[in-house]
UniProtKB/Swiss-Prot annotation:
Full protein name: Zinc transporter ZIPB
Binding site for Cd(2+) 3: 144, 275
Subunit field text: Homodimer. Also exists as a monomer.
Residues annotated to bind Zn(2+) 5: 89, 286
Binding-site residues, Zn(2+) 1: 181, 207, 211
Domain comment in the entry: Has an additional transmembrane segment in the N-terminus compared to many other ZIP family members. This extra helix is important for activity in vivo.
Amino acid sequence: MNQPSSLAADLRGAWHAQAQSHPLITLGLAASAAGVVLLLVAGIVNALTGENRVHVGYAVLGGAAGFAATALGALMALGLRAISARTQDAMLGFAAGMMLAASAFSLILPGLDAAGTIVGPGPAAAAVVALGLGLGVLLMLGLDYFTPHEHERTGHQGPEAARVNRVWLFVLTIILHNLPEGMAIGVSFATGDLRIGLPLTSAIAIQDVPEGLAVALALRAVGLPIGRAVLVAVASGLMEPLGALVGVGISSGFALAYPISMGLAAGAMIFVVSHEVIPETHRNGHETTATVGLMAGFALMMFLDTALG
């Protein structure tokens, strides 16, 4: 009966040990988390007053679109007994391509433009966005390091992961994956510019469909009944509207908060793609199929950005 409290105590001890053994990662997580909190505090009042309330509404609707797409993909698992590993890797590669292109076309480039109007074009603008990129990478690196989770190829990751139920490990992995997507949606609507928000939200929603399906099938593979696996996969999509609120909050406080937050969201998404998604698509020897899927997703996002931007 003391197992949960024992696990919590062990996690606290493991976190302390990891912090001592890897001080740079710990410092990076602390710095990035502090930066996010400061941006959020600075922006929360501004985001909820005046015309910015409309921007919050856009962000929530965008996050809801991501949630609905995840739910649609998860529900598709009810009619599928299984899909081949090659098909799954192609779908995840497609999602990775859309995330990479969204990071470039809908976050980094608009971030550079926004920073250029504040500090002037050139190296100064690039430095502002690069600061955000660094914060995003440090945030996700720290969360990845200190959060127990599991990957199909590398197994248990993070402190005390071997003692946590496999279903919860997958859920934590999904949370780590969906949070930056939701943040990106929120940041893209921070100024109310639909030319930035719509392409990015469309891209994330499109790639959320195969992701939702893959999550439901993965949860079924670790032992959950199909109905419960679908429900958990659907619920995982709630991180997107929650992340969208965080995203619009951190980017609405002051002028430089917007380009910094664009870089932060891009850095977080690129980290997830490189650290999580692409390695998973290569685990079964389907690198070529996954790469073709990635390029198709990248091209589609480029088209969406041109057509809707």
